[in-house]
């Protein structure tokens, strides 16, 4: 479940495991609406908080090493992930082995778009380094920056948080 507040309005997007839904006061009715089927796979990938490298085989991905490249002054391994018709590239820092960047495609408003996600400001949470800043770009323009303020682990969350309201 993701909640954002923009211009005083609350946006909610959630997935209960199979059904995706959202509340979008700007582009919808302001009530919970089902997410189109073609976006469910993207939502499931977003819900995978372990990242792209952990459990990739179990998630149906195969990986190829495409050598070393420069990413903003850091040497990184360029890894190509393939699953069915999907392809994405993950750039992993050659020293720290942290994800620096991801290039993927996403369906937005019925269009497939190239998305570049840049990860930074890694912090240790419960023994795992997590990016506290994620910048999403399309066609070289930043379209969204997510900055985490706090992260809590092992917090009890009711299943009803993910159930689509009537």
PLM region spans:
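Gly/Pro-enriched, hydrophobic low-complexity segments
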Residues: 72-164
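Short, surface-exposed beta-strand-loop junctions and turns on beta-sheet-rich folds
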Residues: 7-10, 28-30, 96-98, 107-108
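Flexible, processing/modification-adjacent segments and terminal tails
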Residues: 19-87, 107-113, 157, 161-166
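Catalytic loop of the DD-peptidase/beta-lactamase superfamily, centered on the K-T-G motif
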Residues: 11-12, 18, 28-33, 138, ...
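PEST-like low-complexity, intrinsically disordered acidic/proline/serine-rich tracts
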Residues: 1-10, 14
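A short, compositionally biased
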Residues: 15-17, 129-130
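Short hydrophobic/aromatic-rich beta-strand segments that constitute the beta-sheet cores
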Residues: 1-4, 21-24, 65, 99-104, ...
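Acidic/polar residues at beta-strand termini and the immediately following turn/coil
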Residues: 14-16, 24, 93
């Amino acid at each position: 479940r993701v909640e954002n507040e923009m211009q005083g309005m609350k946006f909610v997007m959630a997935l209960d495991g199979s059904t995706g839904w959202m509340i979008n006061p700007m582009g919808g009715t302001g009530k919970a609406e089902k997410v189109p089927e073609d976006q469910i796979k993207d939502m499931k990938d977003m819900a995978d908080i372990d990242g792209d490298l952990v459990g990739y085989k179990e998630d149906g991905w195969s990986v190829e090493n495409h050598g070393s490249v420069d990413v903003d002054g850091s040497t990184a391994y360029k890894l190509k992930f393939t699953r069915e018709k999907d392809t994405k590239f993950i750039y992993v820092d050659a020293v720290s082995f942290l994800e620096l960047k991801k290039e993927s495609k996403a369906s937005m408003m019925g269009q497939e778009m190239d998305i570049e996600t840049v990860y930074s400001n890694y912090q240790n949470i419960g023994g795992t380094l997590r990016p506290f800043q994620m910048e999403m770009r399309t066609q070289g323009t930043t379209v969204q920056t997510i900055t985490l303020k706090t992260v809590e682990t092992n917090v009890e969350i009711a299943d009803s948080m993910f159930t689509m309201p009537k």
